[in-house]
């Protein structure tokens, strides 16, 4: 068994020469959260940004605007390196959890409200605050200690 992890793991150059029996798995959050009228409140990209903002703040001390400044490069890298090869995956695993917006809402809203002069990120800050207004908060004690979600809530 050979396991490659990371954004380049599905690149054809890495899989070249491996037996066709090799198995590619593409793992990412891929859920949009909608209201009862079918209006999207939060899409998968905003969930990913939320996860990053909270994680970077908790574990790296990066303020939300620092993460948002890097976000453009993250999306560019995704377009250049991940999207082209994601279609070669044998299986797609959606890592979104239905309860995530309820879990992150209060934290991300507080972080974003503390952001002074978001400048070019004003639209993103306002959109996220408005989106999370629709989700009531739930406590982190409901999340199992073994859950990968712990990376984003800092309970571990």
What are these regions (language model features)?
Residues 9-156:
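Conserved NTP phosphate-binding and transfer environment spanning the P-loop NTPase/kinase superfamily
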């Amino acid at each position: 068994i050979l396991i490659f992890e990371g954004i380049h793991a599905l690149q054809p150059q890495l899989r070249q020469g491996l037996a066709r029996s090799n198995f590619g798995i593409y793992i990412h959050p891929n859920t949009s959260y909608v209201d009862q009228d079918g209006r999207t409140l939060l899409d998968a990209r905003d969930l990913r940004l939320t996860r990053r903002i909270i994680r970077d703040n908790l574990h790296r001390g990066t303020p939300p605007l620092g993460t948002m400044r890097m976000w453009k490069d993250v999306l560019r890298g995704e377009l250049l390196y991940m999207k082209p090869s994601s279609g070669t995956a044998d299986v797609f695993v959606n890592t979104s959890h239905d309860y995530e917006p309820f879990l992150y809402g209060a934290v991300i809203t507080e972080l974003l409200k503390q952001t002074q002069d978001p400048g070019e990120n004003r639209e993103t800050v306002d959109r996220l605050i408005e989106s999370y207004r629709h989700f009531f908060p739930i406590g982190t004690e409901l999340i199992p200690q073994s859950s990968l979600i712990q990376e984003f809530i800092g309970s571990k």
